[in-house]
Amino acid sequence: MVKTAQLLQTLNDQLSELAALVAPLAEHATLSPRFDRQLFHTRSTLMQAYLAEAQHNFNQLRQAVERQQLPQVVWIAERLAAQIAALRRETATWSLRSWDHASPTLSRWQRRRLQHQEYERRLLAMRDQRQRQLAQATSLDEQQRLGKEVEAYSGRLARCRQALDKIENVLARLTR
């Protein structure tokens, strides 16, 4: 039972780590579902939905362990491990995926959306990095410089999000 508890804890830790990796991409949509139905039941185009399904499977695994349903435990554990591996691969290769095929006008706007989502992710990462550096800065000059950089990144992020909202509105009109 101790070994099972350790394995559950390891899976829980992996899911927590994965949630942190997926967080910047969680609400970013793709043109089509990312995984086949054998691996994930959800047909969503949002990464958050796939992560939520993996979390749900982890909860089912925990319940199956408590009820000592060995065949279910084995099946759910294998499925969950495959889901975690697939989500890790997807987050690692996200920036390489520029777009999926669709109609020319629609695909151009969807490509723009994906581009802006990537800009947003990178701006968030840069702003967060500068905020961490600012928290650790010791000299006044360094604090002022980093403070200005954080403000600049926040402004860029706000403009990027405004552009994303406009793109989403155009896409909503095109797909009605």
UniProtKB/Swiss-Prot annotation:
Family: Belongs to the PriC family.
Residue ranges the record marks as coiled coil: none
Assembly mode: Component of the replication restart primosome, which is composed of PriA, PriB, PriC, DnaB and DnaT; DnaG primase associates transiently with this complex. Interacts with the C-terminus of SSB; this interaction is required to load the main replicative helicase onto substrate replication forks. Interacts with helicase DnaB alone and in the DnaB-DnaC complex, probably 1:1 binding with DnaB. Interacts with DnaT.
Record keyword Transmembrane present: no
UniProt xrefs under InterPro entries: PriB/PriC_sf, Primosomal_replicat_PriB/PriC
Protein's name in the database: Replication restart protein PriC
Keyword annotations: DNA replication, DNA-binding, Primosome
Stated role: Involved in the restart of stalled replication forks, which reloads the DnaB replicative helicase on sites other than the origin of replication. Recognizes abandoned replication forks and remodels DNA single-stranded binding protein (SSB) on ssDNA to uncover a loading site for DnaB. There are several restart pathways, the PriA-PriC pathway is a minor restart pathway. Part of the minor PriC-Rep pathway for restart of stalled replication forks, which has a different substrate specificity than PriA. Part of the major restart pathway with PriA, PriB, DnaB, DnaT and DnaG primase.
